[in-house]
Amino acid sequence: MLKLAGKEDKKLKTTVFQDETRIFNPPKELVEKSIVMQWMKKKGFKTEKEMRAWCSSDEHYLEFWDEMAKTYVDWHKPYTKVMDDSEMPYFHWFTGGEINITYNAVDRHAKGAKKDKVAYIWIPEPTDQPVQKITYGDLYKEVNKFANGLKSLGLKKGDRVSIYMPMIPQLPIAMLACAKLGVSHIVVFSGFSSKGLMDRAAHCGSRAIITVDGFYRRGKPVPLKPNADEAAGGAPSVEKIIVYKRAGVDVSMKEGRDVWWHDLVKGQSEECEPVWVDPEHRLYILYTSGTTGKPKGIEHATGGNAVGPAQTLHWVFDLKDDDVWWCTADIGWVTGHSYIVYAPLILGMTSLMYEGAADYPDFGRWWKNIQDHKVTVLYTAPTAVRMFMKQGAEWPDKYDLSSLRLLGSVGEPINPEAWMWYREHIGRGELQIMDTWWQTETGTFLNSPLPITPLKPGSCTFPLPGYDISILDEEGNEVPLGSGGNIVALKPYPSMLRAFWGDKERFMKEYWQFYWDVPGRRGVYLAGDKAQRDKDGYFFIQGRIDDVLSVAGHRIANAEVESALVAHPKIAEAAVVGKPDEVKGESIVAFVILRVGNEPSPELAKDAIAFVRKTLGPVAAPTEVHFVNDLPKTRSGKIMRRVVKARALGNPVGDISTLMNPEAVDGIPKIV
């Protein structure tokens, strides 16, 4: 269980409480049959620690990436240099090569032994609509027809296209068609407003928008095309809107600008030659939703995002040819780009893709999907786990989840008690959980267990092979075990971001400037997250660098107090903020959502405070606990502490257009 540590990092003065002593060793059979163990045996490594250190070492890490690039990707033209850092921080990977990512994801499978293998099992939200199974052969034909349609509109290598679609197969088809032509795609989450789409399309100069007439949400058709119309009105670069007919919603079509998807592909050839590009060619731009500040247009390169995500997915989740993989993210986020579209297809895997809400028509929908389609590996977010915790184990208990063999977590740190619930009720008390830490900027996992790794609840364990990740204090020194600081990448890696679209100064300032002039630290990437390593070297992510409470001289991570609150048997979710205090600087105020079947009361508030005091110590205990029905969250499910704090303190909440549930803001009580 969590023990009191109360240690303090003298440089950052961050008080660290977590000391997780529960360890879950992987089953022997999983270890012995794992992909990474086979590779270790081939290389002669005796231990996981030795292997991870070798792969990330100065002497061998480029050798490692050279092997991975040649293992996972077919190169049209071989590269002549693995990595060129002469223009730091603009790193160039696989110099001199030529590649097409759609060829690697689709063509080579469709022309080989996997032509008839299912690439996607697509489940529509309406229960009266049929499930679709799309083979690699099917995908090849549909991607090529749509790519030829895009060519007929004059789209070409270097152009940019915005994609504004729900979770339907035409979304990855559109992405793959763009990539086949060397066109950069900008996927905009379908839950964003017309302004969100307009801002992104205008900012990056999109020549076209690909969208749908409407989509289904909780059983009802929701129009989407009108948002694209409004966005195009404020984005002068947009020449065409391509509309896929999904929900049968009546929409207006502007002559000369708008074209139906089915008309565009009609009569198009099922063959389309790939456009071979430099590995540094921009594959996509993805705008962060962000918990602070304005969105950033993050540019990702083709070569690195063919190699990194495929290799990490293969090793971390140990995917075999007969697995059925389900990443529950929306493709509008980086998780969907890397782990629903590119990596699973490059590996030739079968993925499940679900259109709708997790709780429609009830909280059993996900578990029914797993039961019906024999999903073997599930990758989801702590937000979803806590939502199901709140409803109780009776929902998953109704279904046969015995096909599952591995679980994963993504999107934010998972608090230890949610981790335990996930393992106990979804994983039958025996499945390992691959808790991955990474970012939109990184393109792929940086820290994660492997199937051979002993686990600690709430820990993303160690840096993955080939990723030199560390924790530094503000002077650039590595912090000792048991301490906290800034999590950084000491070396570049293939899938990392290449730039901010149109903002070189911000790119430099945000990620590289902090340690640039520190001797020996030039080129160190500042992730913007803080973390601690326990006495065994396990990493625990504590949230963003600016998510820190200052209480009586102690710097306390918001996430740590929230984890302690959620460990309370009656609390499902929590957000904590600092309230100005004349004596202590700040006092801690908590906003909590109760699990189903519990009622707010002054006694429960006192009990929650006492629970945190016992778990973390008096300095970390909230002085107030407020019960709320909901907490404002981004579309990717992250709690917007900035908004919670602004509302609670009576300050302007700022732009909340990207919130999933803006109505939750009004439910936050003022505390001053």
UniProtKB/Swiss-Prot annotation:
Q: Which cofactor does this sequence's record say it needs?
A: Mg(2+)
Q: Do you know which CDD domains this protein is assigned to? A: ACS (cd05966)
List UniProt keywords, sorted A-Z: Acetylation, ATP-binding, Ligase, Magnesium, Metal-binding, Nucleotide-binding
Residues recorded as binding ATP, renumbered to this chain, are G411, E412, P413, D435, T436, W437, W438, Q439, T440, D529, R544, R555
Which EC class heads this enzyme's classification?
Answer: ligase
The keyword Magnesium is annotated on this UniProt entry: yes
Source domain of life? Archaea
This entry's Enzyme Commission designation comes to 6.2.1.1
Task: Give the N6-acetyllysine positions (modified residues).
Answer: K638
What does the entry give for GO biological process? acetyl-CoA biosynthetic process from acetate
Task: Report the leader peptide range.
Answer: none
Entry binding sites for CoA? R217, R218, G219, K220, T335, R613
Q: Per the record, what are the reactions this protein catalyses?
A: acetate + ATP + CoA = acetyl-CoA + AMP + diphosphate
What's the family? Belongs to the ATP-dependent AMP-binding enzyme family.
PANTHER family to which the protein is assigned, alphabetical:
ACETYL-COENZYME A SYNTHETASE, ACETYL-COENZYME A SYNTHETASE 1
Cited HAMAP family: Ac_CoA_synth
Protein name per its UniProtKB record: Acetyl-coenzyme A synthetase
Native organism is Methanothrix soehngenii (Methanosaeta concilii)
